Curated annotation (Swiss-Prot):
One of its GO terms (biological process) is pyridoxine biosynthetic process. This is Pyridoxine/pyridoxamine 5'-phosphate oxidase. Its cofactor is FMN. It catalyses: pyridoxamine 5'-phosphate + O2 + H2O = pyridoxal 5'-phosphate + H2O2 + NH4(+); pyridoxine 5'-phosphate + O2 = pyridoxal 5'-phosphate + H2O2. Binds 1 FMN per subunit. FMN binds at residues 67-72, 82-83, 88-89, 111, 146-147, 191, 201. Catalyzes the oxidation of either pyridoxine 5'-phosphate (PNP) or pyridoxamine 5'-phosphate (PMP) into pyridoxal 5'-phosphate (PLP). Its EC number is 1.4.3.5. Pathway: Cofactor metabolism; pyridoxal 5'-phosphate salvage; pyridoxal 5'-phosphate from pyridoxamine 5'-phosphate: step 1/1; Cofactor metabolism; pyridoxal 5'-phosphate salvage; pyridoxal 5'-phosphate from pyridoxine 5'-phosphate: step 1/1. Substrate binds at R14, R15, E16, Y17, K72, Y129, R133, S137, R197, L198, H199.
Length: 218
């Protein structure tokens, strides 16, 4: 059982948010403009893994699952990440492409949430990115049958050494089970911490091809 003192400490952990607010007059017309600005500030602040995002999917029973992956590209078409196509998230996206992304930039007292539909990337896009990765990462993609049960880490390490020897000459080929997804932007919400828990939230939502902006209560 949990220690009562620790539980009491958790209940009282809090702080004020003091890094400034977000005002309607300061918002650009396009959400990606603000996203790019915030992402740049997260990088400039030297946050650990500023491109890390939570990817939320659901299975065929409606059970949600979350995991952290790295954003690898973004433009007006959507946000891109790569993964093993045999993974749980890939199977869940195949069943239900509606997913949610979250960028938790805690040190800046900010969050960005994206909702939309995921679609598979073209083979050309995947090949280009795959061969831009470090060689050991390319080999690592071959090693793991993601989300499958294994008895020990040594199995992965042995397989890695075996494949490193196998692919010693020439390019590492793209695994047929490795690919990526682009998440279209249907909604993008920006959250900025505020004093007295009066946080600022703004929601960008598509409306007849244009972006509608609404302030949301915290």
């Amino acid at each position: 059982m949990s220690d009562n003192n620790q539980l009491q400490q958790i209940a009282h952990l809090r702080r004020e948010y003091t890094k400034g607010g977000l005002r309607r007059r300061d918002l650009p017309a396009e959400p990606l403009t603000l996203f790019e600005r915030w992402l740049g500030q997260a990088c400039d602040a030297r946050l650990a893994d500023p491109t890390a995002m939570v990817v939320a999917t659901v299975d065929d029973k409606g059970q949600p699952y979350q995991r952290i992956v790295l954003l690898k590209h973004y433009d007006e078409k959507g946000l891109v990440f790569y993964t093993n196509l045999g993974s749980r998230k890939a199977h869940q996206i195949e069943h239900n492409p509606r997913i949610s992304l979250l960028f938790p930039w805690h040190m800046l007292e900010r969050q960005v949430m994206v909702t939309g539909k995921a679609e598979r990337l073209s083979t050309l896009e995947v090949v280009r990115y795959f061969h831009s990765r470090p060689r050991d990462s390319q080999i690592g993609a071959w090693v793991s049958k993601q989300s499958s049960r294994i008895s020990a880490r040594g199995i992965l390490e042995s397989k890695f050494l075996e494949l490193k020897q196998k692919f010693q000459q020439g390019e590492v080929p793209l695994p047929s089970f490795w690919g990526g997804f682009r998440v279209s932007i249907e909604q993008m919400e920006f959250w900025q911490g505020g004093e007295h828990r009066l946080h600022d939230r703004f929601l960008y939502q598509r409306d007849d091809g244009a972006w509608k902006i609404d302030r949301l209560a915290p």
